[in-house]
Amino acid sequence: VPTAPNSRKAGLPNLGIRCAVNSKPFFFVRRNAMQLASRFASRSPVLRSERPLSDDQIRAVAPSIFADAPHESRSERYSYIPTATVLQELRGEGFEPFMVTQTRVRNDDRRDYTKHMIRLRHSSQINGREANEIILLNSHDGTSSYQMLAGMFRFVCSNGLVCGDTVADVRVPHKGDVAAHVIEGAYEVLHGFDRAHESRDAMRAITLDAGESEVFARAALALKYDEDKPAPITESQILMPRRHDDDRRDLWSVFNRTQENLTKGGLSARAANGRRQTTRPVQGIDQSVRLNRALWLLADGLRQLKA
């Protein structure tokens, strides 16, 4: 097996996947597939529940969802349909919100209009281990169109995955019959989950050897940390299972262990100056979505290679 020429550690097998991380080929991830219509500040207020959220619960965390008018900067051409109205219609179609957040803003006059995110589930898309989630992004200040992404939620570890581009994104501009187009887009994402399930099941059927797992972990580290500097944690740390059921060699388990360890933090690390520290959880919503999406694309690229 040939050696990856740009890996930080010689002798690792080249899995034949390429990644545009810092413009250096290593593993395959399409950056343009990770472009979001919204950008979120770090440490955005987040609320996630085991039961559908009420309007009062949502309003306490993300008041911009209930804006009664667009921001004053919007022109008359801006078709204003509040996210709360769209949410109510989605509820009528069986979609319920289980997580909400909105970005922090420096200007108070934009707080009630700023970008926000809702993760919704349909009653038909929940099973014992995972739930399909539609990730809805929007704003009322012109900084974001309506955008819907596909995601999964693992109950065992409370991890919110993002399904790369296995399921197509849907974007709805603030023009015309916005609510109808958003509902149509939600069903489009919903019907695309079969492809995500096929990818997940195929990952479960693929066994990785130690070298392949290490290469996957190395590429995952490059997605989060500057490739020009040594990562503060090692491949073996992010491959370490946090529960017995995840101690498996299949690609799905390797992917989930890597995702959880990179996003939840809590690992003993060494800074560039040699000081000991503990990795922090990924709290920025935009950063979280981008990293999770990139990790899915990484795993799915390996799945396709191993098929």
Residue ranges, per PLM feature:
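Amphipathic, interaction-prone secondary-structure segments
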Residues: 80-88, 92-145
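Short, Lys/Arg-enriched N-terminal segments with co-localized hydrophobic residues
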Residues: 13-33
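Generic low-complexity, intrinsically disordered sequence content enriched
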Residues: 19, 32, 57, 91-94, ...
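Intrinsically disordered, low-complexity regions enriched in serine/threonine
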Residues: 34-40, 124-128, 140-143, 152-307
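Acidic/proline-rich low-complexity IDRs
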Residues: 11-17, 86, 297, 304
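Feature for intrinsically disordered/low-complexity regulatory segments and propeptides
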Residues: 34-84, 88, 98, 109-110, ...
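Intrinsically disordered, low-complexity segments enriched in serine/proline and basic residues
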Residues: 2-4, 23
